[in-house]
Swiss-Prot record:
Protein role: Secreted lipase strictly specific to mono- and diacylglycerol, but not triacylglycerol. Shows the highest activity on 1,2-dibutyrin substrate.
Protein name: Secreted mono- and diacylglycerol lipase A
Organism of this sequence: Penicillium cyclopium
Propeptide: 303-305
Chain segments annotated as transmembrane: none
Binding annotation for Zn(2+): 263, 265
Family (UniProt): Belongs to the AB hydrolase superfamily. Lipase family. Class 3 subfamily.
Residues annotated as signal peptide: 1-18
Residues bearing glycans: 251
EC number(s) on file: 3.1.1.-
PROSITE patterns for this protein: LIPASE_SER
InterPro entries to which the protein is assigned, alphabetical: AB_hydrolase_fold, AB_hydrolase_lip/est, Fungal_lipase-type, Mono/diacylglycerol_lipase_N
Lineage of the organism: Eukaryota, Fungi, Dikarya, Ascomycota, Pezizomycotina
Keywords: Disulfide bond, Glycoprotein, Hydrolase, Lipid degradation, Lipid metabolism, Metal-binding, Secreted, Signal, Zinc, Zymogen
């Protein structure tokens, strides 16, 4: 199905779903919060050209000061990728000896507002599971860099056999990270952890249920961020569960009580229930514990529609 965002937007208001998500009555723990705040800094680092075009052995750094904990680990780049495909997928593989982790990070888009304004959403069969359909652009972004990344991961993991694999991303990078983690779990990395901040929906209900069943998924939304509301439910797209919904305002420190844990692939208790996606709500999109995209260069000018 191929529909533009604005053509389909009005359809969502009339939707009804029989299987709403369940809002858990617990706060996250302090140790969980520490993990959430830490891994997003790897996503933040992926926006810096110096990191996604780094030389092997270079330390990750964030000149805008939004990844201090990552800098403190001394994590080094073992592989990076950028501008190598028509999808402009960018990111890096880093080794964090302090936390015994191999990190695969995907950069978000430099022009996400234009992506929202102009987006068309087409399903494709990724071959991950029976009945599973993924969004074509997100799947293509992963598929075009997959072989090289898997080759590099094999070498890095062989050198660090007891390290965990962590896949991270923000915004469109989170969508690619979600599909990458899903695919990698079936290719020798079954325990790969996913930290997806502000991810759009990546596929249909069958794919969402498949990814959810794999486990080790941490998907974050923030107040009324419009990007996780896309592609629309009316277009056949469903989220991975659970959702960690951050309710604190922009530019504010997040406490354990500010994060609500919501189970279910279709839920109106969290971000989805805050209304239709609006282009005026983008401040919520860039603040996930830190200003995640502070390191990005100039993107395309915002297109008024």
């Amino acid at each position: 199905m191929r529909l533009s965002f604005f053509t389909a937007l009005s359809a969502v208001a009339s939707l009804g779903y029989a299987l709403p998500g369940k809002l858990q009555s617990r706060d996250v723990s302090t140790s969980e919060l520490d993990q959430f705040e830490f891994w997003v800094q790897y996503a933040a680092a992926s926006y810096y050209e110096a990191d996604y075009t780094a030389q092997v052995g270079d330390k990750l750094s964030c000149s805008k000061g939004n990844c201090p904990e990552v800098e403190a680990t001394g994590a080094t780049v073992s592989y990076d990728f950028s501008d190598s495909t028509i999808t402009d997928t960018a990111g890096y593989i880093a080794v964090d000896h302090t936390n015994s982790a191999v990190v695969l990070a995907f950069r978000g888009s430099y022009s996400v507002r234009n992506w929202v304004a102009d987006a068309t959403f087409v399903h494709t069969n990724p071959g991950l599971c029976d009945g599973c359909l993924a969004e074509l652009g997100f799947w293509s972004s992963w598929k075009l860099v997959r072989d090289d990344i898997i080759k590099e991961l094999k070498e890095v993991v062989a050198q660090n056999p007891n390290y965990e694999l962590v896949v991270v991303g923000h915004s469109l990078g989170a969508a690619v990270a979600t599909l990458a983690a899903t695919d990698l779990r079936g290719k020798g990395y079954p325990s790969a952890k996913l930290y997806a901040y502000a991810s759009p929906r990546v596929g249909n209900a069958a794919l969402a249920k498949y990814i959810t069943a794999q486990g080790n998924n941490f998907r974050f939304t923030h107040t009324n961020d419009p990007v996780p509301k896309l592609p629309l439910l009316s277009m056949g797209y469903v989220h991975v569960s659970p959702e960690y919904w951050i309710t604190s305002p922009n530019n504010a420190t997040v406490s354990t009580s500010d994060i609500k844990v919501i189970d279910g692939d279709v839920s109106f208790d969290g971000n989805t229930g805050t209304g239709l996606p609006l282009l005026t709500d983008f401040e919520a999109h860039i603040w996930y514990f830190v200003q995640v995209d502070a390191g990005k260069g100039p993107g395309l000018p915002f297109k008024r529609v």
